[in-house]
Regions:
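Short S/T/G/P-rich N-terminal loop/turn motif that feeds into the first structured element of a domain
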Residues: 1-56, 64-74, 97
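C-terminal structural segments of small proteins and small subunits
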Residues: 66-93
Length: 97
């Protein structure tokens, strides 16, 4: 099993209200990939955070193996969600697999 963990910071230009909307969209879009991507065992996006947090959202996903993770990165459903609900709003991204 391979874990894929990402922390995102959203762009500073957004109000807190807009950031909440963006986080909801990220969570809904990414979690909807469950069952659509071969080898994706679980996927959770955490958006509830304390004021002391330095990240706006976190993804925690598990894959059967490294090949499944590589396939996820280019899977059309993932790319669609990432390009519409994540990448346009992100200032920084930190990943650990």
């Amino acid at each position: 099993m391979v874990r894929h963990i990402i922390l995102w910071q959203l762009k500073d230009a957004y109000s807190e209200e807009r950031k909440q909307e963006i986080r909801r969209g990220m969570k809904e879009g990414l979690e909807s990939l469950q069952g659509k991507v071969p080898g994706l065992l679980s996927i959770t996006v955490k958006t509830d955070r304390l004021a002391s947090s330095s990240a706006d959202a976190m993804l925690d996903a598990a894959f059967t193996d490294e090949d499944a993770l590589k396939a996820y990165r280019v899977h059309p459903e993932h790319v669609k969600v990432a390009d519409s609900r994540v990448r346009p709003f992100v200032k920084t991204r930190v990943c650990m697999d």
